């Protein structure tokens, strides 16, 4: 039989009978038991499949090669008798007369650089007390996400983390770290507990291909948005990437330590593409898992060379299986989808439904980027902003409308936003406060669908953006009082808005990457969190800390009710001031019966009239913790400092 062309494979895989004949619902991957292990591989187009066994994850002698037997629905399998924990393996899959050696797409462990898969008894990788680890219960009003790379978190020698754990999973487990070990200024986990964020979003932690795990990491760096093995933790973050079980145990220890601190873990997942097309998915069933152009070439909506075909039944099943695996075996508390606009909405809703079926699964967060990285061949309803109405109300999106309204556009370094004085932007600030629930632009099902933010790993840090707007040639490491005030104002807006607050790690201490807007493979020194800045800008850190606590003390801001923003009462003020009042919900435990909030993006003090009653000053342009003490009470008019968010509580 003549070999199929890529275009012919595309035609076959878009054929309903193919899916009817080959869709499979049974177990896949390694099924370990002490008496033996069954390997199962879905490869319906394969002519032959063999497995080669190894004692080591890299190099070493071959222990043997055995054929797999084809069964129903294109599933190949083999039973390996005896104890197989720690045994490494690869498949050789023959399709179209071409044989490709590959790892197992369903592998749960792997050797160095993820080339060889490993059979693992997950029970042996459980850290002490893992069976008692539970997801922390975090009320909506307390939810705020802090995004960080495992590497960036502790790479700085000033972090106080022991050298062997810097840039590793284990850094999250070290208690009581302080700046240079001074015993005074907290860093890492110690710092997070004090700051008050309740979720840490980890940039990709599943096995990625851009860092050579076999080489020293001193000069290697990558964010990790180039996955290789979707169900295996990244090895460069472990203390020993050559032993497949170590990365699993240490990743779990990291998660358990965060949970013990009352912090949930959000996993940044990148199923939308792979590092190379020569990966376990494509080597097993060539062309099936990736979208194709009309000529059979790979579509490139990710901007990285390929894009995952989530709409195909077994691809969707793989996506759901992988998400559930991380949720169940790693106790993950949330998932952030990179380029979620490259998935069809039906698949994302199916992921949400699958998570909801787990015990406590309805509390697992799910949100993503509602855009693509290029032209896509996805011709179904994309999970993007335009189709927000088609997504489950507990699927959230990053709101670039909020981001750009507050600080200015991302693609022009000098374009200002509201906090830098952009004319007319106050209209969008009002919409952002209401999480766009009162706008026709992108009305969500619920305010909690909107992820409100001003900085993430992509594009400029907030500090760098503020300086780029202010100066043609900014000095990023110089202290700037106006930029600091604008930073506080930006935080004051999104942390007093409806929606899910999100921040890039270090935003709260004026993190700078010295004007580098895309540092995905820049030096470790540029990307690391500079813990000295947390001390140098401690007043800014305290401002974020106070706002997070203030928000938690007024639960209505975290409401998941679509109608909640309708209670906002906006004031008619002189432009560009924005002001609003929001009554509390009776019985929700709010510290005040109402909030009254004003934003002043100008360089002069303004005076505003307050609603009738007595209003305690809770937060102003420099301190967000006034509410903790005996602060001033206003009854008529009140001043607004330049570049400030000012918050009052009804007493």
Q: At which residue positions do the language-model features occur?
A:
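The feature marks proteins involved in alpha-glucan
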Residues: 1-34, 62-63, 70-174
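Carbohydrate-binding surface patches
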Residues: 31-47, 569-611
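Conserved alpha/beta catalytic core and glycan-binding cleft of carbohydrate-active enzymes
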Residues: 120, 352-353, 358, 362-505, ...
């Amino acid at each position: 039989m003549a070999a199929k062309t890529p275009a012919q494979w595309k035609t076959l895989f878009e054929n309903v009978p193919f899916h009817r004949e080959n869709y499979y619902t049974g177990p896949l991957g390694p099924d370990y038991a002490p008496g033996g292990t069954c390997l199962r591989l879905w490869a319906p187009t394969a002519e032959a499949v063999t497995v080669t066994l190894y004692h080591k994850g890299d190099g070493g002698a071959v222990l043997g090669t055995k054929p797999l037997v084809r069964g129903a629905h294109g599933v190949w399998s083999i039973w390996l008798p005896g104890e197989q924990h720690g045994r490494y393996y690869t498949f050789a899959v023959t399709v179209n007369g071409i044989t490709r050696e590959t790892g197992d797409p369903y592998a749960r462990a792997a050797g160095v650089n993820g080339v060889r898969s490993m059979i693992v008894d997950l029970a042996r990788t459980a850290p002490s007390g893992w069976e008692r680890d539970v997801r922390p219960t975090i009320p909506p009003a307390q939810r705020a996400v802090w995004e960080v790379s495992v590497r960036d978190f502790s790479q700085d020698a000033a972090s106080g983390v022991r050298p062997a754990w810097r840039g590793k999973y284990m850094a999250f487990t070290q208690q009581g770290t302080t700046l240079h070990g001074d015993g005074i200024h907290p860093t890492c986990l110690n710092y997070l507990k004090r700051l008050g964020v309740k979720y840490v979003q980890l940039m990709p932690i599943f096995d990625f291909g851009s860092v050579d795990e076999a080489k020293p990491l001193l000069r290697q760096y990558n964010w990790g948005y180039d996955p290789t093995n979707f169900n295996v933790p990244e090895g460069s973050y472990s203390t020993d990437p050559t032993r497949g079980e170590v990365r699993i145990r240490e990743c779990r220890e990291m998660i358990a330590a965060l949970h013990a601190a009352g912090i949930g873990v959000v996993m940044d997942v990148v199923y939308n593409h792979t590092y190379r097309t020569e990966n376990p998915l494509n080597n097993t069933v060539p062309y099936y898992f990736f979208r194709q152009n009309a000529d059979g070439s790979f579509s490139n909506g990710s901007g990285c060379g390929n894009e995952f075909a989530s709409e195909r039944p077994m691809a969707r099943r793989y996506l759901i299986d992988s998400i559930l695996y991380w949720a169940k075996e790693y106790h993950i508390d949330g998932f952030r989808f990179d380029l979620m606009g490259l998935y069809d909405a039906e698949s994302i809703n199916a992921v949400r439904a699958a998570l909801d079926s787990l015990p406590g699964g309805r509390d697992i967060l799910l949100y993503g980027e509602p855009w693509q990285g290029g032209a896509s061949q996805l011709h179904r309803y994309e999970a993007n902003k335009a189709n927000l109405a088609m997504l489950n109300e507990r699927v959230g999106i990053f709101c670039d409308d909020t981001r750009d309204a507050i600080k200015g556009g991302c693609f022009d370094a000098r374009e200002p936003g509201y906090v830098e004085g952009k004319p007319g932007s106050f209209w969008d600030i009002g919409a952002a406060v209401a999480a766009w629930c009162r706008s026709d632009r992108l009305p969500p099902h619920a305010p909690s669908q909107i992820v409100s933010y001003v900085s993430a790993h992509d594009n400029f840090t907030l500090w760098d953006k503020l300086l780029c707007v202010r100066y043609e040639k900014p000095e990023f490491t110089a202290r700037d009082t106006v930029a600091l005030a604008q930073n506080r104002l930006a935080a004051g807006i999104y942390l007093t808005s409806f929606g899910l607050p999100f921040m890039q790690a270090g935003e709260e201490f004026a993190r700078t990457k010295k004007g580098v807007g895309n540092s995905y493979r820049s030096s470790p020194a540029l990307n690391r969190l500079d813990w000295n800045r947390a001390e140098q800008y401690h007043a800014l850190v305290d401002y974020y800390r106070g706002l997070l606590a203030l928000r938690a003390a007024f639960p209505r801001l975290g409401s998941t009710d679509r109608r909640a923003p309708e209670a906002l009462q906006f004031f008619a003020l002189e432009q560009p001031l924005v002001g609003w009042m929001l009554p509390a919900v009776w019985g929700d435990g709010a510290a005040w019966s109402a909030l009254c909030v004003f934003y002043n993006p100008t360089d002069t003090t303004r005076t505003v009239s307050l609603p009738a009653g007595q209003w305690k000053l809770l937060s102003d342009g420099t301190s967000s913790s006034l509410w903790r003490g005996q602060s001033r009470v206003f009854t008529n008019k009140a001043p607004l400092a330049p570049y400030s968010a000012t918050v009052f509580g009804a007493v």
